[in-house]
Amino acid sequence: ASAGPIAFVNDSKATNGVAAARALEAFDNIYWIAGGLAKEDGIGAAAQALDHVAGAYLIGESTPIFARALEGRCPATAHGNLHAATTAAFADAWAGGIAATVLLAPAAASFDQFNSFADRGDAFTGIAQKLAASVSGTGRGGAHA
């Protein structure tokens, strides 16, 4: 989904730091949604791939661990669930008024809040579509699924 200059990217399968780092290196001006059930390496390699990250929106049990790892590296905020994090990331990206990516690349397993990474990704896609539709009449570009 996209809304004007904002693209939503679902990489829910990025369940470890290395996979999330690859996603973070692929885009510019990223509003990154991360977290869930932390794996052994925690946020891992993703903490070294923050050059294009405008902010991190943390969810799940891993929030305190990830927040400590990101401290001093990029702005990070805690959110109670995926809906709250996606909404906040989109609001911040939209307020920026330039091309941006709201990226779900959790660097963690989904099992603290979802049945699978696919369920988490489907939830993100649904939220993204609703957010895109909510701004489709604002004159700043249409919404695209």
Q: For each predicted feature, which ranges?
A:
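ATP-dependent carboxylate-amine ligase
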Residues: 2-145
